[in-house]
Regions:
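Short beta-strand micro-motifs enriched in acidic
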Residues: 45-49, 134-138, 202-206, 451-453
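Short, acidic/hydrophobic/Gly-rich beta-strand patch recurrent on exposed beta strands
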Residues: 22-27, 146-149, 213-215, 343
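Short, aliphatic-rich beta-strand segments
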Residues: 201, 208-217, 274-278, 379
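Short, solvent-exposed loop/turn elements at beta->coil junctions and helix N-caps
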Residues: 116-124, 189-190, 196-198, 202, ...
Length: 455
């Protein structure tokens, strides 16, 4: 039977796709339905049809799944931030474990590998230490802020996101109130006019320090002192800055920073390591789970105090400084110069001297240091972006033959692809651990431990 756009189907949702969508079948025709939960019986309208599969819009939940829960957020279906709020947290964790295992099996070709139980959260809300709120206007001309609807740049008005810290709403109310009082216009992407583009808020979970950074299409905001005075009524306020971005693009932050009040950074800690965090710093957004993740990476590194370690894609030195406590020496590599400046500052802040940091691409720095300067590694740790590791880097790791490789990944598909290369001959997949860094979303972090086969 042929199905077409706008057809209405009754579906039993039997599986869950990698993006959290429900999967059902009608006469062999597979339909992917956003917001449907495994175990649901639903009515769905076909919005896109191919020969053997299509995409549907959830019209009605006829019989709810035992795993379906009422979303804690009233706009969960419109907002692009959460994909799994209608799924019980226990089932979210199972979905993420299955996703990682499936990628390692299908893409990596691995079988019968040891996988530890996923590390979830006791309280899977209010976990984000950073949020970036776009500012705009609704159809009535009212200033709004919140998050983009999925796959759009349409702002869903929401100042009280349940993933962020509770103090965010107070900040947003004060900034939007200031804009209304002093007739400050939000930035308009279509015209390139308007001033306020985004409001960034960062929060130190262990220090209760708060940073507000206004991203402007200009150099200053009207009545700056009045805004600073208002924000400083928030007890946790530590840093207020302006970031200037006058370019017509979708990049949030520009290069120019100006301090309005307080420090230019906040401080937070992971374990017993403290970090200075600026508006431009990369820092894991879930500090509670990051400590578990890095603890697992340290465990898989198997350090005794005699090892030389390379930490590739090291950011502001978060993993490097963790490793340095147990290693003889650690070398970190990161392409962003300011991140390396932060890493060096963080090493000084913690009195850690057995580290060295390099600015550059990991796939350029590591081959250069190995082939020209003869450096080696007992352990190599990689924590690449979603696209995974460069082929040149993987080949250099195979040439260097460290005893162990620890791979920290935010994308299990590219992880599986890279592991297939590393484990083709020289390395064995020893341990796999997953961490739920982003509850209510489909994202999951994975740590993998590899051992050289001849050791």
């Amino acid at each position: 039977m042929e199905f077409r756009k706008n057809d209405i189907l009754t579906l039993d949702i039997e599986d869950c796709g990698v993006d959290g969508e429900g999967i059902g079948k009608a006469d062999g025709f597979t339909v992917f339905v956003k917001d449907a939960v495994i175990g649901d019986r639903i009515s769905a309208k076909i919005i896109k049809a191919k020969k053997n599969y299509g995409y549907g819009r959830l019209m009605e939940v006829i019989t709810p799944s035992p795993y379906r829960v009422k979303p804690a957020c009233s706009i969960a279906r419109q907002c692009g931030g959460c994909q799994l709020q209608a799924l019980s947290y226990e089932q979210q964790l199972k979905f993420k474990e299955k996703k990682v295992r499936g990628h390692l099996e299908r893409i990596g070709g691995f079988e019968d590998f040891p996988m530890e139980p996923i590390m979830g959260m006791e309280e899977p809300y209010h976990y984000r230490n950073k949020a970036q709120f776009p500012v705009g206007k609704n159809k009535d001309g009212k200033i709004i802020t919140g998050f983009y609807a999925g796959r759009t740049h349409s702002i869903i008005d929401n100042r009280d996101c349940i993933l962020g810290v509770k103090q965010n709403k107070d900040v947003l109310d004060r900034v939007i109130g200031h804009m209304e009082k002093y007739h400050v216009q939000p930035y308009d992407e279509t015209t390139g006019k308007g001033l306020v583009r985004h409001i960034m808020i960062r929060y130190g979970f262990h220090t209760d320090e708060m940073m507000v950074c206004l991203i402007l299409n200009g150099d200053k905001i009207p009545a700056e002192k009045a805004l600073v005075d208002s924000l400083c009524e928030i007890p946790e306020m530590t840093s207020i800055t302006i970031n200037v971005n006058k370019k017509r693009n979708n990049v949030i932050l520009g290069d120019q920073l100006r301090l309005l009040w307080g420090q230019s950074y906040i401080t937070d800690s992971i374990g017993n390591i403290s970090y200075q965090i600026s508006p431009l710093s990369f820092f894991q957004v879930n500090p509670i789970q990051t400590e578990k993740l890095y603890g697992k990476a340290l465990e898989y590194a198997g350090l005794t105090g005699n090892e030389t370690v390379w930490d590739l894609y090291c950011g502001i030195g978060t993993i490097s400084l963790f490793l340095a406590q147990k290693a003889k020496f650690v070398r970190g590599v990161e392409i962003v110069p300011q991140a390396i400046d932060n890493a060096r500052e963080n090493a000084k802040l913690n009195g850690i001297e057995n580290v060295e940091f390099f600015v550059g691409k990991a796939e350029e720095v590591l081959p250069r240091e190995y082939e020209k300067n003869g450096v080696y590694a007992d352990v190599i740790v990689v924590d690449p972006p979603r696209k995974g590791c460069d082929e040149v880097l993987l080949n250099t790791i195979l040439k260097m033959k460290p005893e162990r490789v620890v791979y920290v990944s935010c994308d299990s598909a590219t992880l599986a692809r890279d592991l297939k290369v590393l484990c083709a001959e020289d390395y064995e997949l020893m341990r796999v651990s997953t961490t739920d860094m982003f509850p209510q979303s489909t994202h999951v972090e994975t740590v993998v431990g590899l051992q050289r086969k001849d050791t």
